[in-house]
Amino acid sequence: MTLIFQLTLFAFVGLSFLLVVGVPVVFASPNGWTENKQVVFSGIGFWFLLVFAVGILNSFVI
């Protein structure tokens, strides 16, 4: 169970870093928002899923 928690937490941190870097780049590019809107929303949705998964898995680890 600890390994699953650690992998989920690593994915959460990695995705958070990608979103922190990627979303401003998308907004700064000329047609970035219209072309990458679906990718940004998918990333945000997956981020929320990982937030809840880390919270639930945390209750089993501690």
Curated annotation (Swiss-Prot):
Record's keyword terms, sorted: Chloroplast, Membrane, Photosynthesis, Photosystem II, Plastid, Reaction center, Thylakoid, Transmembrane, Transmembrane helix
InterPro entries, A to Z: PSII_PsbZ, PSII_PsbZ_sf
Record-level GO BP terms: photosynthesis; photosystem II stabilization
Primary location class: plastid
Gene3D superfamilies associated with the record: Photosystem II PsbZ, reaction centre
Keyword rRNA processing: no
The keyword Chloroplast is annotated on this UniProt entry: yes
Membrane topology of the entry: Multi-pass membrane protein
Transmembrane stretches, start-end: 8-28, 41-61
A Pfam family: Ycf9
GO CC term (a single one): photosystem II reaction center
Subcellular location per the Swiss-Prot or TrEMBL entry: Plastid, Chloroplast thylakoid membrane
Subunit note: PSII is composed of 1 copy each of membrane proteins PsbA, PsbB, PsbC, PsbD, PsbE, PsbF, PsbH, PsbI, PsbJ, PsbK, PsbL, PsbM, PsbT, PsbY, PsbZ, Psb30/Ycf12, at least 3 peripheral proteins of the oxygen-evolving complex and a large number of cofactors. It forms dimeric complexes.
PANTHER family, per the entry: PHOTOSYSTEM II REACTION CENTER PROTEIN Z
Annotated HAMAP family: PSII_PsbZ
Family per record: Belongs to the PsbZ family.
Protein name per UniProt: Photosystem II reaction center protein Z
Organism: Tupiella akineta (Green alga)
